[in-house]
Structures are given as C-alpha cells and as structure tokens.
C-alpha cells in the first residue's frame, strides 16, 4: 500500500476536523430553536463582519410619530412633487407605492371609500393598539380600518384621511423624499403602538428578555394601570400587556433586561446619544432597560446608570447644539417633543416637517465639522397611528409572527451619497436600521439576535459610493433651527392608548 505523505496526511486530518465542525454547527442549529434561520446562514448576512465600505462616521435616526405613506405622502402623487403617474399600488421602479383612491372598506356598501383631507394638526386620535392592528389587517384583507376606534372630535370615516398639503406644510417632507431616498416597503416591526415600537428601534425587541424574544413573547401595548412614567421608573401598579403566540396574555412591570444596540456600540467604542423629551416617556426606550436606567428604587424611582447620565439627553433640541459644536455622537436617536412629532389629536402638532428640516439643514449646511459628507440620516415614523394603508405587511414565520410585522411607515434616507429621487423596493423594518448601524460600525450584522437578525436587508441600496458626495441644498421650511433652540413650550405628552 502506498503511504500518504506526511504533509498531505496533516491536511486530510484538518479537512476532516473542519467537516465535523460544520456538521456539529448545523446539528446544534437544528436542535436549538433560538438559532438563526438557515436562510440567513446560507446567505452569509446574519453575522457579516467587516466595515461597510462607506465614508459614514455618523448615523442619525429621526423617529417621528403615527403616520402611513398613504396618509402623509399623497403629495408625491400631485404637482409640484409628482403627477398622476408618479404613484401606483403596483409600482414600477420609478413609482411611489401610494394609493390615492378606492381605499378598501368592508363597512362601505361599495367595498371602498375614497379618502378625504384633514390637517396635520387634527382634532382626533385613532387607536393603534394591537387589537386595532388585527381589525385593520382583517386576516390579510386589509379592509378593516373602519373598525378602529376614534377618540376626540371625529369626522365621518376618520381612518380614511390623508394630510392636506394645500398650505405647503408638508413641503419639507416631500422635498426630502424626492431629493433623496424613499422606501416603498418600510414596515414598523411591531403590530402595535409607541412603547414597543421604540423598544424595537433601540433594542431590536420589545420582549422582556432574550428568552422571551425567542419564545415570541413581546410587550404589546403602552402603559396600563397606575398612570405615570414608563419603564423601570414606573409606579407600583403600572404594567404593560404581553402578546404571545396564542394571543394577548398576561402583563408585566415595564422594566426589561436584555442587550440593546447601545451595548454593541459601547463594546466597540462607538459613541451614542438618545435625545428625548422626558425621562418617563413611553418614547424614551432606554428607560425600560434595567442596566441602562439603573433605577434607584424598585418602583417609582429615577434612572441613574452611567449610560443614562452620559448618553440620554432630555432636551431634543440639543441635537442642534451638538451639531453646531461638532459634538455629534456617532449614532444618535432623535425623539421630538409632542408638538413636533406629527402625532394626531392636537391642533398644535404641526412642527414636525420644520423640525426634521432643521436637523437635516444643520448637518447639510455644516462647514466646520464635515458632517454632510460623513453622515447618514434616517427619517422614519414609529407606527401607523390607526390610519389606512393599502399595503399588507409580511408576517414572519415562527413564533415571532404573532407580533411582526406591522403596517407600513414612511422611511426617507438622506445623505451625500443617496441619489436624487431614489425609490427602494426592498422590504425593510426597524431591524434594517439596526443592521445598517451594525454594518457601518462593524458590529456584526444581526448580532443582537432580535429584529436585526430577522431583517432581510441593511439599507445599503440607498447609497452610491462610485461617485463623489452630492452638494447640499437647504430644505425650505417655515421654522428654522433657532426657533427650536429657543422653544420654551412645555412638551406635549405622548399618547397612552
């Protein structure tokens, strides 16, 4: 018998060990229900390592409130920002996926209702609880919006309305959408309201723990019980309802413990800041994470953790000061005061378009810090707000499908490397935003193992790096940065429905 050369023998042994290791990994994944889906492993995108080959050194996430594309962006379908062929419910590459008429309504004798206009600062609010999602979704028929509860001064068919732009109040949003990138298929990750939505955009899950996320158990609603602050400083008797694969079941004190993307940023020396209007707000995601808040009492206390003290800023307009002072963190979440949030139900809530424009203009017109050429700005809305939208959301397979995904929300991507009037037709959710941050800063895509791992993309299609940075043109708006810096109004509280 021929003897195998010693060097070749060693190579064969190493090859066998490699095969056994791969087999063991596959077997472990088959046995562990929390293992990443095989599709992600095959594609090699789940734990992608290596920096995104971009000039980005900063990512700013601007998180507005309670709108759908059909409700807020009808202006893309009409002059001066579009025309009757600009929009379609079966869009081609250069069309916006927006429905302008014949909205599905099972309560109408004709089966449809044509939408009508309402002001941005309107007089009523629609439920956006999990039950409201189920009503509107109606088993995938998307015709149940008329069953969503309305509170306040409600017109006829209040759910079937779009924001009136006859005064030009939405022009800053429309200018941004047509000058930069728009997502036709951006879905909120959760099927419910603001508190869980903010948990997803910051931590990738609204589950109380990593084990709960793997089991499909999520915080589904805003606070109930004793009125007061949210998160780990909530009062005794405050709770949040849970949703499980068998439906809404049980409740829990709203203080959770699991990793968030801020932990990944800390571990890699990447700075971050969360601008928000109140320590106890349901919009303040870090207040519900035990190791960030570090409350000084079991209930009803104050947050005092290192990350809380150093990285949570309770005055949103300080983002404008930090930009002008060249002190912008590498990753920022910007949560507005109620008056600038686009949240329905208050005639004073009309500052959103100017607020967003002020932040974009501060970055775009910067001549000292170099922010325009190295910052990606992601503008999105936290949930659908009970408004009609025609596009049915994809529902996840497995136990997470009991609460993911929700309805569409707008997403506008602004950067010096985003083509003019770019329309993206890939599916996205808040997990896509987390993946984008992970890839830009080499954190490992999907490494939290939550919505970031379940997302199918990371927004890279919005950018073209084979050409130099675009020059910036100021976004015209009625109110400028000085208005917001000097605004002394008491912030309107968020909804709690």
What are the roles of these predicted feature ranges?
Residues 7, 25-27:
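A composition/secondary-structure signal for short, hydrophobic, low-basic-content segments
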Residues 11-22:
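Bacterial N-terminal signal peptides
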Residues 1-12:
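Bacterial N-terminal signal peptides that target proteins for export
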Residues 27-497:
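N-terminal pro-sequences and low-complexity stem/linker regions of secreted or lumenal proteins
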């Amino acid at each position: 018998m021929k003897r195998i050369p010693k060097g070749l023998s060693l190579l064969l042994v190493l090859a066998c060990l490699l095969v056994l290791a791969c087999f063991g990994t596959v077997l472990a994944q088959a046995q562990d229900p929390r293992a990443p889906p095989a599709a992600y492993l095959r594609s090699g995108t789940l734990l992608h390592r290596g920096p995104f080959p971009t000039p980005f050194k900063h990512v700013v996430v601007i998180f507005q409130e309670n709108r759908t594309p059909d409700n807020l962006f009808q202006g893309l379908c009409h002059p001066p920002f579009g025309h009757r062929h600009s929009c379609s419910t079966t869009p081609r590459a250069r069309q916006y996926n927006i429905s302008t008429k014949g909205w599905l309504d099972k309560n109408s004798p004709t089966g449809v209702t044509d939408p009508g206009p309402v002001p941005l600062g309107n007089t009523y609010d629609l439920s956006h609880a999990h039950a409201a999602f189920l009503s509107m979704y109606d088993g995938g028929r998307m015709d149940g919006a008329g069953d969503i509860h309305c509170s306040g001064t409600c017109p006829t068919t209040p759910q079937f309305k779009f924001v009136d732009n006859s005064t030009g109040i939405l022009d800053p949003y429309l200018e941004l959408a047509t000058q930069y990138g728009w997502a036709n298929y951006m879905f909120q990750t959760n099927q419910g309201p603001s508190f869980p939505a903010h948990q997803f955009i910051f931590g990738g899950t609204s589950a109380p723990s990593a084990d709960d996320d793997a089991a499909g158990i999520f915080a589904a609603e805003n606070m109930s019980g004793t009125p007061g602050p949210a998160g780990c400083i909530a009062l005794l008797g405050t709770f949040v309802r849970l949703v499980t694969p068998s439906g809404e079941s049980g409740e829990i004190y709203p203080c959770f413990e699991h990793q968030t993307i801020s932990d990944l940023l800390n571990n890699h020396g990447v700075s971050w800041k969360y601008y928000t209007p109140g320590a106890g707000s349901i919009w303040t995601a870090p207040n519900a994470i035990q190791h960030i808040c570090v409350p000084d009492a079991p209930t009803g206390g104050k947050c005092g953790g290192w990350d809380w003290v150093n990285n949570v800023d309770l005055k949103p307009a300080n983002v404008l000061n930090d930009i002008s002072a060249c002190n912008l963190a590498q990753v920022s979440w910007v949560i507005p005061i109620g008056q600038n949030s686009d949240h329905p139900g208050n005639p004073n809530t009309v500052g959103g378009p100017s607020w967003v424009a002020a932040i974009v203009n501060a970055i775009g017109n910067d001549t000292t810090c170099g922010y325009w050429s190295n910052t990606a700005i992601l503008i999105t809305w936290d949930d659908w707000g009970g408004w009609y939208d025609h596009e049915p959301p994809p529902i996840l397979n497995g136990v997470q499908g009991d609460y993911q995904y929700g309805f569409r929300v707008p997403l506008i991507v602004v950067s010096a490397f985003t083509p003019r009037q770019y329309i993206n037709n890939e599916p996205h959710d808040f997990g896509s935003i987390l993946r984008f941050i992970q890839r830009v800063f080499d954190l490992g895509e999907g490494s939290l193992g939550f919505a970031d791992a379940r997302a199918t993309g990371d927004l890279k299609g919005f950018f073209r790096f084979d050409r130099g940075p675009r020059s910036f043109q100021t976004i015209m708006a009625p109110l400028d940065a000085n208005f917001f810096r000097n605004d002394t109004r008491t912030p309107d509280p968020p909804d709690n429905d």
